[in-house]
Regions:
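Glycine-rich beta-strand-turn "strand-cap" elements at beta-sheet edges
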Residues: 1-13, 51-60, 86-112
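Short flexible/disordered coil segments
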Residues: 18-20, 76, 80-85, 106-112
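An amphipathic, aromatic/His-enriched active-site/gating alpha helix that lines ligand/cofactor pockets
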Residues: 9, 32, 36-48, 67-101
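Residue-level signal for secondary-structure boundary sites
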Residues: 26-28, 72-74, 108
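Short, well-ordered beta-strand segments in beta-rich or mixed alpha/beta enzyme
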Residues: 14-21, 51-78
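Short, surface-exposed ligand-recognition loops at beta-strand->loop->(often short) alpha-helix junctions
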Residues: 21-31
Length: 112
């Protein structure tokens, strides 16, 4: 993290943030898959929070925002059965591959 970015992060808050953006061709099916995934992911070791957001301006677009205690927790989750099951369940219900991005916690606040 750059020195400038580090100045905006609260002391002691070190998060690994991941976003997954999905564009569906079968919205009801995708929401069912993602809802199950969110519940199971929240139980994973190191998960700080997971949110599911739906776009108001682009119908069928959904965003999953994950916060992890460490990069190792996030990597373990991406290799987990929960993640693999979610990915397999998305077969045939997405307009294209999901957009997955890793974020730097430039300004983060932890409510814990």
């Amino acid at each position: 993290m750059s020195d400038v970015a580090a100045e905006h992060v609260e002391p002691g808050v070190d998060l690994t943030i991941v976003t997954l953006r999905f564009d569906s061709i079968d919205d009801a099916s995708l929401l069912a898959v993602l809802s199950k995934y969110i519940v199971l992911t929240r139980m994973h070791d190191g998960c700080r929070n997971v949110d599911l957001c739906s776009s108001v301006s682009v119908p069928g677009r959904h965003l999953v925002v994950q916060k992890w205690e460490t990069p190792e927790h996030q990597r373990r989750h991406f290799d987990s059965a929960t993640m693999i099951d979610m990915a397999r369940s998305c077969d045939g219900i997405l307009a294209g591959p999901p957009d997955i991005d890793l974020w730097d916690a430039t300004s983060a606040h932890d409510l814990r």
